[in-house]
Each structure stands twice: as structure tokens, then as C-alpha cells.
Amino acid sequence: LLRLTTIRRFQEAHSLSNAARTAVVAWLMTAVYYFYQYTMRSAPAVMMPQLSDAFGLTTMAVASMVGLFYYGYSPFSLVAGVAMDRLGPRKVVPLGAATMGVGALMFATGDNQVASFGRFLQGAGGVFALVGAAYIAMTHFPASRAATLIGATQMFGMAGGSAGQFVVGPIIASGVSWNTFWAGMGIVGLAISALLFVLLPPPKPKPAEADGAWLKTAGRTMLLVFRNPQSILCGMIAGLLFIPTTIFDMIWGVRYLQEARGFDYATAVIRSSTVPFGWIIGCPLLGFVSDRVGRRKPVIAAGAVVLLLCLAWILYGPTDVLPPYVVGLVAGIASGAAMLPYTVIKEANPPEASGTATGVVNFLNFTFSALLGPVFGWILVSVSGGAARMSLEHYQTAFEPLLYGVGLALLLTLFLKETGPAVRRPAPLAAHEGL
């Protein structure tokens, strides 16, 4: 009997080991997909003149075309969240990567309408990367590691964002044509899709539902998440902390540094890429700190304060006082706090709504980028009178509202309910009340 028990325990341990290994591989591959998605998201910033010439559009019109990414990304966040809860990652994440690959190939055609729809598809397919990685992290790993793993996921994403500027910039400058780059990225996307299909584990079997019942269940789950005020707060805080990167740095950063600060192209690309590089450090670091102290709100608030100071310095401070690249790097590190609402919304909603919760916060987050991107561009054109080259004052006037947005995020954090492990652990006395 003892021998049988020992064998059974060994088999259970071996099974758990295999399951853990499968989960790690699945999360890692989905994080690589997120790296790829962010590379494609940020790459247009370093080739705006080439895109403007190729499409025969003004820089502002190209910025609007590039912004179509968020018009696909934001609404499909809800689709991705529901699909993840319903079907599991293996059935939907590879499809998202394939959609991104096709979108890149369409963008490479150089036809305005085809490229615009291709950019939209890149956003629609790209949303499955973060939602899939976060779903795997929350359902296959201990809750005490949630913020760390989601932060690590965003680390991969921002590594791609940094590569989209720091690596792609020199590639384009070396003479590689913009459409060759996009065609190559399309092929990479299709390859990632195939790997995801092979490496992601099959979904766990679920009880059969009557025809149409799953749609009602999905609707109830989404309504449950949207009705939770904490969900709305999470989306607003994340969105307000994200837009300094998604709108200012990733679309206008290089041009701002060239026109307003007088840097050459190569230096502007490197300086701009320090922000997403800072995210690489900040996302896992702040996630780890939050898990370590067992609280979310203080870390979000601290990150918002530091980001506010850095953003004010980037817009109004001199460029020759602090060491090069420091302010952008610190701004990126502080921006990592924007990922903590992704953990909070999951902790503030039922476990069975995990995927939907991620979809909702992603939808609210990037709705800010989708709606406000053209607004900031319009303000910049208005204050400059449509000038071909903008001045420092033009950029300061156009992007000063970003400071108010980060300040609002800090204020909203005060109303956020603390959901960290420290408040979810039973108090020592309460744990012994029944003794």
C-alpha cells in the first residue's frame, strides 16, 4: 500500500511538473507574440517621411492612418476577452497572430485603402497577444504572482516597442525599403501563428450548453464586469497612464525631438526608444514590488507621480542638465504602473470572468489612444497653423493636456479599491476565531 501511494504521488508530481512546463511555454510564446505586436505598433514612428512619400499623404494624414491600429485594437479587446473565456487561448490566439501577419502584408502594398484596412487588422489581431498572455498568467499560475507575470508580459511588449524604434530605425536608415520591412513582418506573423497553434495547450473540456446559451453567458459576464465601478476606474487609470507613450512617444516622439529640440534623426530615435525601454524595466519591477508589498494602489500612485514629473521635464525642461536618455528611461519605468490596473480588474471581478476583465480594461485603455490620438494631432496642426515644421511652443501647447491626464489618473487611484494579497489574506485573529 505504501509503495502504491508513493508511485501515485510520484505520478501526480510528474503530471504537475508537465502542466507547469506547458504553462510556462504557452505564456512565453504568447509573450513573444506580444513583442512582435508592439514592434509593429511602434515602427511607423521611425519611417513617417518614407510613409508620407509612399502614400502621397501629409504627415498628419499618415499619423491618422497609423492610428487605425487602435480602432481595431480597442473594440476587439472585448471580442478577445469573451473568446478567451469561451474557447481558450489555443483556438483564438494563433488566429490573432495570423490576422496581424495578413495586415502587415496588406500595409506593404502601398495602396492607401488596402494599407489602411491592413493597419486596422494589425490592431484587431494584435489584441489577442496581451489578452491571451494575461489569461494564461491568471489561470495557470498562483495568484500571488499575477502582477509580476502581467508586468513581465508587458516587458516583452515594450521590448518590442523599443525594437520598433531602436532597431527598425537603423534598418530603414541603412536603405531597407519600408514595404520590404512590412512584408517581412507579415511573414514573421504567419510563422508565429503556426508556432502558437503547436505550443499552446488544448482547452479544458467544459459542460455542454444549449444553442445560444453561451452568448447569454458571455453577455452576462461582460455586463457584470462593466457594471463594476472598479472596472471603469481601472480602464481610465490605465488609459491615462498609457497615452504619453502610445500617442506622444510612439507617434510624435522622434519628430518632436528633431523639430523642437534640434536632435539629428539617429539621436532622436535613440532618445525616443528609451521610453519603451524603460517600460521593459518598469513593468516587471513594479509588478514584483506590488506583489511583494501585497498592495496595488501605492505603486500605481508612485508611478503616476514620477511619470508626471518626467513628462513635465520632457516638455518644459532643458535638455543639457540631466544625463542623456535618463528622463525618457525613468518616464518609461514609471509608466509600468499602467499595467497594475490589469491585475486589479481581475482581482475585483469573479475568476470565471478573467478573460473578459482583461478585454474590458484593454478596451477602455486603448479607447483613449484611439479617440485622443487624432485630437492631439488636430491641436498640433491648429496651434502651428499647419506649418511644415513645428516649434517647441507648438508641441508644448498641444501635449500639455497629457500632464492633466496623468494628474487625473493619480486622483482616480484614490478611489480605487485595494485588491492586493495583503488585504485578501485573513487577519491572524480572524483566522483563529473558530479555535
Regions from the PLM with identified roles:
Residues G118-G157:
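Cytoplasmic helix-loop-helix junction between adjacent transmembrane helices
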